[in-house]
Design a protein with these regions (language model features):
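An N-terminal-biased, well-structured beta-alpha scaffold segment characteristic
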Residues: 11-25
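PLP-dependent class I/II
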Residues: 4-6, 22-28, 33-49, 81-82, ...
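N-terminal glycine-/charge-rich "phosphate-binding" loop or analogous flexible N-terminal tail
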Residues: 1-12
């Protein structure tokens, strides 16, 4: 392997949200979704060149940026994005919030598929809307969509938007074309706009191809809006950059107004440079990263099968977030998170933060050197041995 993903890079005392948020330095953080790997060399080299210039004034988004994004998605995913459809923004979470603001009024409902990314809930409620849930069905260590329930929920006249997570965090599903088609047909039938968070789109594994929702026929997608970013795949979340893709001109105008309502979307020069480098020169690094992450998942699956048979993990089709079933402990997940942090010195995410359907589950971030993952699994095993 050309890139050394086994290298352990100290991250404490770098103001890392992941590593420096714990009160004690011996807590192993396998929680929030950023990776413990250096980003692609092409990105660090491009950033170093930009830093060397020494002037960091107001920045515009050049045509080359849009060309790099469009070329990447066309080549790698077969999705033809037009430059005019894109809105630059500082992240997917503020993008989702602005889209909800643009497409709803207070009192409307926004549909989600729980368990789901926790920031969806705050983005909905902070805009004065209500959360409507289409719970995913957990069976055989994976999740499927209850389409009958989705039809019922979408038929509510107060439901105006559906937030789709594709690939899905934390379930690890990569929705198939057939599943996405059904979502589109139901949403279109009930005049519900699909807003697809596709931030994990590059992180899929063999046999599970990412299908951009908006790449489906327009007769299915309607006025769909998509949020994309290189931040997860290339580990550049701190550079705060993302794109909204909205083919419909009127919807795009409303979203652009909502984003700029507080005039807080100035361009980050480093995010622009990093994105262009990632999409132009980062593909080989990404492919090797995916192979390493797949190896981490295999390692964890084998470890759990041998040492933690009562704690099955979901089949991982995409993302680097593994969903573990801990219901055998009959312990609320928030309490389990607290006890693991205090007693095992291991920080995982409590499943309940992703909706009540996540209660009893824990989310692991396996985007780290294998030695760190192994240490985390040993700590979890020791905790279970002493607890039981």
């Amino acid at each position: 392997m050309k890139y050394d993903f086994d290298e352990i890079i100290p991250r404490r005392h770098t103001n890392s949200y992941k590593w420096d948020s714990a009160a004690d330095s011996d807590v192993l953080p396998l929680w929030v979704a950023d990776m413990d790997f250096r980003t692609a060399p092409a990105i660090t080299e491009a950033l170093a060149d930009r830093v060397g210039h020494g002037i960091f004034g107001y920045t515009r988004v050049p045509d080359e940026y849009y060309e790099a994004v469009c070329a990447w998605f066309k080549r790698r995913h077969g999705w033809a994005i037009e430059k005019e459809w894109m809105i630059y923004t500082s992240g997917v979470v503020p993008a989702v919030s602005a889209i909800i603001k643009a497409l709803t009024v207070p009192g409307d409902k926004v549909l989600v598929q729980t368990p789901v990314y926790n920031c969806f809930f705050s983005s909905i409620r902070n805009n004065g809307c209500e959360v409507a849930s289409n719970p995913l069905v957990y069976e055989n260590h994976t999740y499927r969509i209850d389409f009958e329930d989705l039809e019922r929920k979408a038929s509510d006249e107060r439901v105006k938007v559906m937030l789709l997570c594709n690939p899905h965090n934390p379930a690890g599903r990569v929705w198939t074309r057939e599943e996405l088609m059904q979502i589109g047909e139901i949403s279109l039938r009930h005049n519900v706009t699909v807003v697809s968070d596709e931030i994990h789109c590059e992180l899929t594994y063999p046999g599970h191809a990412y299908i951009p929702f908006a790449s489906l026929p327009e007769t299915v997608t309607g006025h769909a809006v998509t949020c994309i970013s290189p931040s997860k795949a290339f580990n550049i979340a701190g550079l705060q950059i993302a794109n909204i893709v909205a083919p419909d001109e009127e919807i795009r105008r409303r979203i652009d107004k909502a984003i700029n309502i507080n005039e807080v979307c100035d361009v980050n020069p480093f995010g622009v440079i990093a994105t262009m480098a990632a999409y132009r020169k980062g593909e080989d690094w990404l492919d090797q990263l995916l192979a390493y992450l797949q190896g981490n998942y295999r390692y964890m699956k084998e470890f759990c099968t041998e040492h933690l048979p009562d704690f099955p993990i979901c089949k991982l089709e995409g993302t680097y977030l593994v969903w573990m079933d801990c219901r055998t402990l009959a312990t609320p997940s928030a309490e389990l998170e607290h006890r693991l942090t205090r007693e095992a010195r291991l920080w995982l995410n409590a499943g309940a933060m992703y909706g009540k359907e996540g209660e009893g589950f824990m989310r692991w971030n396996i985007a780290c050197p294998r030695a760190i993952l192994a240490e985390g699994l040993e700590r979890f095993k020791d905790f279970i041995v002493h607890k039981t």
